[in-house]
From Swiss-Prot:
Biological classification of the source: Bacteria, Pseudomonadati, Pseudomonadota, Gammaproteobacteria, Methylococcales
Annotated SUPFAM superfamilies: Aspartate/glutamate racemase (SSF53681)
Top-level class of the enzyme under EC nomenclature: isomerase
Keywords: Cell shape, Cell wall biogenesis/degradation, Isomerase, Peptidoglycan synthesis
Protein name: Glutamate racemase
Role this protein plays: Provides the (R)-glutamate required for cell wall biosynthesis.
Positions bound to substrate: D12, S13, Y44, G45, N76, T77, T186, H187
Signal sequence, renumbered to the chain: none
UniProt gene name: murI
Pathway membership: Cell wall biogenesis; peptidoglycan biosynthesis
EC number in record: 5.1.1.3
Organism: Methylococcus capsulatus (strain ATCC 33009 / NCIMB 11132 / Bath)
GO molecular function: glutamate racemase activity
Catalysis: reaction(s): L-glutamate = D-glutamate
């Protein structure tokens, strides 16, 4: 197998990164994709940065062992904690996530932008640096959203409990004048409809999965790594948590999944 026929590896703390995988599949229909849900260590957002870094390196090594020609860190928290060390260790392109503050600032007329993200992302030096670089004239309201990741992991995208959680953590930024909301966690696009219901039609909602997918395509093209196959690509899925639990969530978020493989023990265990 030549280098450009190898698969692309994608991972997240759970199933949230499927929102990014969906965008990758849309722009790279012929590529084979590997996806790891690190559900045995979910959520990343409330864990120490050192722990997340070790998990990201471990999952990255697994993807490389499966022949990945590039790795997408489809998790804002893991990007903030681990992208630098991953790029230093791995000799393949490593693409990360960051909240879409730059497009949000361009869209905002009230000059108030809300960022909905995990505690780990909002407390990271990477996020503070991003705010400092892009929001000189804009007020940024950083709002952690505990419970959102867990609801998405359960495949619970519309129950009264989920609606209440979404309202609880969306309204504070709106009450302070935000006219643009940034979804700073890859789980949150699965709640975008509920967020829009709370925010109303005049509030912009910014997510970055499509931008990351386009960046990945450009990088693969520049490095000569795009597949030459014309057949549709396939997806393979692993989970470090109970595979049957991940399978139920995947059935809701990625219809057509037939199998979720357990991550091998050497990669699934904590560090």
């Amino acid at each position: 197998m030549t280098g450009n026929e190898h698969p692309i590896g994608v991972f997240d703390s759970g199933v949230g990164g499927l929102s990014v995988l969906r965008e990758i599949r849309a722009v790279l229909p012929h590529e084979n994709l590997l996806y790891v849900a690190d559900s045995g260590h979910l959520p990343y957002g409330n864990k120490p940065a050192e722990y997340i870094e070790q998990r990201a390196l471990t999952v990255g090594r697994f993807l490389l062992s499966r022949g990945a020609k590039a790795i997408v860190v489809a998790c804002n928290t893991a990007t903030a904690a681990a992208i630098t060390v991953m790029r230093a260790e791995f000799r393949v392109p490593v693409i990360g996530m960051e909240p879409g503050l730059k497009p949000a600032v361009a869209l905002s007329k009230s000059l108030v932008v809300g960022v909905l993200a995990t505690e780990g992302t909002l407390k990271s030096a990477k996020f503070r640096d991003l705010v400092g670089r892009t929001t000189e004239k804009v007020e940024v309201i950083a709002q952690a959203c505990p419970g959102w990741v867990e609801q998405v992991e359960r495949g619970d995208l519309g129950s009264p409990a989920t609606r209440d959680l979404v309202r609880r953590y969306t309204e504070p930024a709106l009450e302070r004048g935000a006219d643009t909301l940034v979804l700073g966690c890859t789980h949150y696009p699965f709640l975008a409809g509920l967020i829009a219901d709370v925010a109303g039609p005049d509030v912009h909602i910014v997510e970055t999965g499509s931008a990351v997918a386009r960046h990945l395509r450009r990088r693969l093209e520049a490095d000569g790594l795009l597949t030459r196959r014309m057949a549709p690509g396939v997806e393979l899925f692993w989970s470090s948590g109970p595979a049957e639990v991940a399978g139920r969530s995947l059935a809701v978020l990625w219809p057509g999944v037939h199998r979720v493989r357990p991550l091998p023990a050497g990669f699934a265990a904590g560090d």
